């Protein structure tokens, strides 16, 4: 790691973001991570690759799942946010889908504003086929949300600037 001699607690935010604990050291002394253009990775054995696919060992199996470039980006975002981890998604819809599918299960409820991106509206309607109840409200406002909250409510979903009416 670059700047190993500096204690991380002494680093200011910008320095920590560039060189903090979550940021990997780079090959050949590079000051930024290389852009990985590899689409597949080889390993000594199929057992080693199987462990990577099952998330029982670190490594990369296929670039759409992850690669060193995306890993460096996720580590920096995590450092920026001070989180437990980060996942980079290829689109906003993949981020929304991953978020909802990791929180919800059959029998859960969602309260959602009706002024959402069309793909998000479609996803929410599709979730109903899996036993997830979606309650739509015209605007994301506390007065409209509170009466709908139940023990089964897991998500209140809205957009900062709703489509198409900007409400």
Enumerate the language-model features and the residues they cover.
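A glycine-rich helix N-cap at a beta->alpha junction
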Residues: 127, 131-140
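Buried hydrophobic positions in well-ordered alpha/beta secondary-structure cores of metabolic enzymes
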Residues: 29, 77, 95, 110, ...
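Short acidic loop-to-helix transition motifs that present clustered carboxylates
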Residues: 93-96, 139-144
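Short amphipathic alpha-helix with an adjacent loop that forms part of the alpha/beta core around
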Residues: 143-153
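Active-site core of PLP-dependent enzymes with the aminotransferase class I/II
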Residues: 162-167
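N-terminal "arm"/small-domain region of PLP-dependent enzymes with the aminotransferase-like
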Residues: 2, 6-67, 75-76
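Conserved PLP-anchoring active-site segment centered on the Schiff-base-forming lysine
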Residues: 102-118, 137
């Amino acid at each position: 790691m670059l700047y190993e001699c500096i204690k991380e607690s002494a680093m200011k935010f910008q320095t920590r973001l560039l060189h903090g604990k979550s940021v990997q050291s780079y090959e050949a002394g590079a000051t930024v991570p290389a852009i990985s253009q590899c689409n597949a990775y080889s390993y000594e054995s199929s057992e080693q690759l199987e462990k990577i696919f099952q998330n029982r060992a670190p490594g990369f199996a296929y670039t759409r799942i992850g690669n060193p470039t995306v890993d460096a980006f996720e580590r920096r975002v995590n450092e920026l946010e001070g989180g437990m981890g980060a996942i980079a998604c290829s689109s906003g819809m993949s981020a929304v889908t991953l978020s909802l599918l990791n929180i919800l299960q059959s029998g859960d409820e969602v309260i959602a504003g009706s002024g959402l991106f069309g793909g998000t509206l479609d996803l929410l309607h599709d979730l109903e086929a899996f036993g997830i109840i979606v309650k739509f409200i015209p605007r994301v406002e506390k007065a409209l949300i509170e009466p709908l909250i139940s023990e089964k409510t897991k998500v209140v979903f809205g957009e900062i600037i709703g489509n198409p009416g900007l409400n």
